[in-house]
Amino acid sequence: MAVPKKKTSKSRRDMRRAHHALVNVTGAECPNCGEVKLPHHVCGSCGHYDGREVVAQAEA
């Protein structure tokens, strides 16, 4: 079984964990339907991106 040869210092441990923070996801309003969507992504509600329909939505 593998074991560390030396104890990891608090500084090295914390530097490794520096990138583990969670970030809030920012949402943008779809100009077509007003739903919240991810920036630079197709709207999941209406299928529009950059002013045009790229995903055809089924009529419900």
Swiss-Prot record:
Protein name as it appears in the record: Large ribosomal subunit protein bL32
Species this chain originates from: Paramagnetospirillum magneticum (strain ATCC 700264 / AMB-1)
Keyword Ribosomal protein set for record: yes
The family this protein is said to belong to: Belongs to the bacterial ribosomal protein bL32 family.
Cross-referenced PANTHER family: 50S RIBOSOMAL PROTEIN L32 (PTHR35534), LARGE RIBOSOMAL SUBUNIT PROTEIN BL32 (PTHR35534:SF1)
Biological process, per Gene Ontology: translation
Domain of life, per lineage: Bacteria
Lineage: Bacteria, Pseudomonadati, Pseudomonadota, Alphaproteobacteria, Rhodospirillales
InterPro entries: Ribosomal_bL32, Ribosomal_bL32_bact, Ribosomal_zn-bd
